C-alpha cells in the first residue's frame, strides 16, 4: 500500500513554529497553509501539519497533550549522513529547541533528538545503508 502521512501537531504560536522549522531547512506547502495551519513538507509523501490549538481542537474531543510535560508522539526522520543529523539538530538547538536526550551511536546507526518550541520530540537518525538489509 502506498500512502501519504500527515502528522498533526498542536502549536502555541504558528508563526514561531514556521520560523523555527524554516531555520532547519523545511519548506511549506502554501496551498495547505493559512492563519490556523501550516503544511510542513518532510518528503514527497510525508508532511507535518502544524495547527493552532484552536484548529487542532476541531479534530478531537480529547484534551490536547502538553508536550512539555507528556509525550504524545516521537517523530523520527532518517537523513543521508551523520553530518546532516548534526547540522539539523545543532540548528534546532540554536533556534530555541532543547536536547531531548544524549546522542546515540551504534556504529551502523547514529541519532540525536530535540524538543521543538512546543515540546514535541523530533529524532533525527542516520543508518549505514550497507548495514540495512534489503
Where are these regions (language model features)?
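Residue-level recognition of short loop/turn positions
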Residues: 1, 45, 117-118
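N-terminal beta-strand motif that seeds the catalytic metal site of vicinal oxygen chelate
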Residues: 1-18, 72-77, 128-134
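Core segments of cupin and vicinal oxygen chelate
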Residues: 8-56
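Membrane-topology and secretion signals of cell-surface/extracellular proteins
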Residues: 24, 66-68, 124-125, 129
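Short beta-strand/turn micro-motifs at beta-sheet edges
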Residues: 60-65
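Mid-chain, well-packed structural core segment of small domains
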Residues: 73-90, 96-97
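Vicinal oxygen chelate
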Residues: 89-134
Amino acid at each position: 500500500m502506498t500512502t501519504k502521512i500527515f502528522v498533526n501537531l498542536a502549536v502555541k504560536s504558528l508563526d514561531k513554529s514556521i520560523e523555527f522549522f524554516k531555520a532547519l531547512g523545511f519548506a511549506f506547502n502554501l496551498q495547505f497553509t493559512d492563519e490556523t495551519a501550516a503544511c510542513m513538507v518532510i518528503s514527497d509523501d510525508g508532511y507535518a501539519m502544524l495547527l493552532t490549538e484552536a484548529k487542532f481542537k476541531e479534530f478531537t474531543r480529547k484534551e490536547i497533550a502538553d508536550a512539555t510535560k507528556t509525550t504524545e508522539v516521537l517523530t523520527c526522520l532518517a537523513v543521508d549522513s551523520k553530518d546532516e543529523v548534526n547540522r539539523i539538530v545543532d540548528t534546532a538547538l540554536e533556534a530555541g529547541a532543547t536536547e531531548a536526550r544524549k546522542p546515540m551511536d551504534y556504529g551502523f546507526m547514529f541519532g540525536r533528538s530535540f524538543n521543538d518550541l512546543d515540546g514535541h520530540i523530533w529524532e533525527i537518525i542516520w543508518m549505514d545503508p550497507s548495514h540495512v538489509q534489503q
